[in-house]
Amino acid sequence: MAEPEESREPRGIRLQKVLSQAGIASRRAAEKMIVDGRVEVDGHVVTELGTRVDPQVAVVRVDGARVVLDESLVYLALNKPRGMHSTMSDDRGRPCIGDLIERKVRGTKKLFHVGRLDADTEGLMLLTNDGELAHRLMHPSHEVPKTYLATVTGSVPRGLGRTLRAGIELDDGPAFVDDFAVVDAIPGKTLVRVTLHEGRNRIVRRLLAAAGFPVEALVRTDIGAVSLGKQRPGSVRALRSNEIGQLYQAVGL
């Protein structure tokens, strides 16, 4: 015998509760977002507070940025120290990021690392078990920008930024920067900020060396919307909801 309609449990979870649990906003603030038309479910703007969704299958966006609802997904920012290899394991016994995070994060074998760095370069790397996001972030077609602070030998001339934006021919083809700025200078050394979206091996070091300014120290500070901030070398933190959403947006997810 069929169960009476009025006695059936409503399917799904209230949308404002889902947003609150995802860390987007408090329940009350989430309700206002819905009423204001800032929330989409599966491509449609939702303004009804009684809307229920299944977090396992629904695609929810706030202000156009996707909200991650799958609690099994992990998104981390690591400040890789200098001298450590960008691998989860190393068969030669060299220090690697897998050694660093296994003490802090469970399930490290399932994590993909995004934004590989040379052993002698420090700075921001992303770690996630979201394979689709990791793949897209690493694919050059999505052109996710990465920013570095480089200490170079010598005094940088005023026109170097223009030269780097125009492009320099390297052994494996031309390379360009998206942005370049001098941050600080002392006699014999200059600190510069470089932003580019490609990820060829040692591209920043090779590009600056080809321009006549060998790199003495290099730190990656940003990948897309995620910034290193005040993270200490060796530290790991969970990405904030807005950071994850902006990464999704950057790669068209």
Q: Which residues does each PLM region occupy?
A:
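Basic, flexible Lys/Arg- and Gly-enriched helix-loop patches that mediate nucleic-acid binding at interfaces
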Residues: 2-253
